[in-house]
Amino acid sequence: MKETIILEKVKVGDASAFSLLYDLYWLKVYNFARLYITSSSAISEVVQDVFVKLWESREFLDVTKNFDGFLFMITRNIIFNYSRRYFNELNFKMTVLKGLRIHMI
């Protein structure tokens, strides 16, 4: 099935077309995320989040524009959000450990 037809069906909420779109693109999203994230479980989480976001924003799909660009923009934003959460959590853990170290002395 042609990509524009799949996208038009996804846009109106066709779940089977979305499943087909997932099958066509999940590996591209996975490999793109792998460039920035090393944990395979985190990469899988990013892929899942990308497709959830895509489904939630399906009404904004413009079948005449570059779908790859749209998809990778979503992926990039989710990777940034993941990285921000990861580093904030890491920073918090480091702060707690420093606090514990001070109290142990």
Question: Can you annotate each of these PLM segments?
Answer:
Residues 19, 31, 41-44, 65, ...:
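Residue-level preference for short helical/loop micro-motifs built around acidic side chains
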Residues 11-12, 51-66, 85-86:
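Sigma70-family region 2
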Residues 59-62, 73-92:
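Arg/Lys-rich amphipathic alpha helix in sigma70-family domain 2
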Residues 1-28:
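N-terminal module of bacterial RNA polymerase sigma factors
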Residues 23-40:
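Amphipathic, Lys/Arg- and hydrophobic-enriched alpha-helical face
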Residues 98-105:
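Acidic, proline/glycine-rich intrinsically disordered inter-domain spacer in sigma factors
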Residues 45-52, 65-77:
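Structural recognition of an alpha-helix C-terminal capping motif at a helix-to-coil junction
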Residues 2, 40-56:
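Conserved RNAP core-binding helix
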